[in-house]
Amino acid sequence: MLHTMGKSTNLDNEYKIIYKREKNLDRFLDQNEMKKLEKINKKFIQKIIMIFSSFIKSNIELNFYTVKINSYTNDDKNFKHLYANSLKIETLEKKSFIFFSPNFLSVFIDFLFGGKGNSIIRMDIKKEITYTEHVINKKIVGFIIDAYCESCKDFFYIDIKFLDFNIIKLNKHFFYTNDLFITNYFSFNLNGIKIFLSILIPVSIIKEKNKKIINFLDKNIFSKKTILKENFFIENLSNIELDVTVELIPSYISKHTFDNLREGDVITIEDPGKVTVCIEKKPIFLGKHKIFDEKSIIFLEKFLHQNLEKK
């Protein structure tokens, strides 16, 4: 089913964002999660078109985009090989991928060297990647990562790192992992030439699984006062507030130093980025503290209670 997502303006040209989503996508994402994904993709399209247009000094237009599950492209049957970039989502220790159409890099390279891309008509891929392709690929992947992470920041923070670049055969099974991936496929038009890229992210990135194991001191009153218990798994409750305290990982000073402390003295903290997060004075997990977009953010690294592990 095709949906028109409204009009946006880029480089004084108006275009419609047309997208098609897999019919069974609602088996994996609820309506709120799908809306979140649509907003992220819309922002990404606007950002990446501006970046690509500036990079190759030429107009680029979106044809359409699709959202599917565990696919490389909009229609995998049309291709034998793709350029593949393996990525790592550092905050969650999960993999992600970016795939390019067989003509993607050659068209960009032709534009960058003064051509119009129309000399590139083949849709196959050479077995070996050239040095120029490596350099241009890494530059473009950097653009995509920055644009996608920036598009996500209104909903969540992700830190994506480049891992590897190679060529894959689509007739071989690639998804060996148990993770489900959302395939965000974007078809573009450069000077009449169709190219595409696909961004694959784990479904768990979009899923809102912020479930906690808690119990109430008074089960008849919804209160902020909560204590942690081992066997009560909250799944469908909302509007629950927990008192969260963030503490620095303990550092140590000598008794002599302590006895001689004066106002204005400086105390060295061994690792100020490391913190312990507590609820009702009970340590819950270890994390890293960072400042992002003028906000304090804690990255969860390790639960301190085995029953709090994700299920």
From Swiss-Prot:
Entry GO terms, CC: bacterial-type flagellum basal body; plasma membrane
Any one Gene Ontology molecular-function term assigned to this protein's record: cytoskeletal motor activity
Localisation: Cell inner membrane; Bacterial flagellum basal body
SUPFAM superfamilies recorded: Surface presentation of antigens (SPOA)
Domain of life: Bacteria
InterPro entries to which the protein is assigned, alphabetical: CheC-like_sf (IPR028976), Flag_FliM (IPR001689), FliN-like_C (IPR001543), SpoA-like_sf (IPR036429)
Pfam families named among the record's database cross-references: FliM (PF02154), FliMN_C (PF01052)
The entry's keywords: Bacterial flagellum, Cell inner membrane, Cell membrane, Chemotaxis, Flagellar rotation, Membrane
GO biological process per UniProt: bacterial-type flagellum-dependent swarming motility; positive chemotaxis
Keyword flag Methyltransferase: no
Family per similarity comment: Belongs to the FliM family.
Cross-referenced PANTHER family: FLAGELLAR MOTOR SWITCH PROTEIN FLIM, YOP PROTEINS TRANSLOCATION PROTEIN Q
Protein name: Flagellar motor switch protein FliM
Species annotation: Buchnera aphidicola subsp. Schizaphis graminum (strain Sg)
Highest classification ranks of the organism: Bacteria, Pseudomonadati, Pseudomonadota, Gammaproteobacteria, Enterobacterales
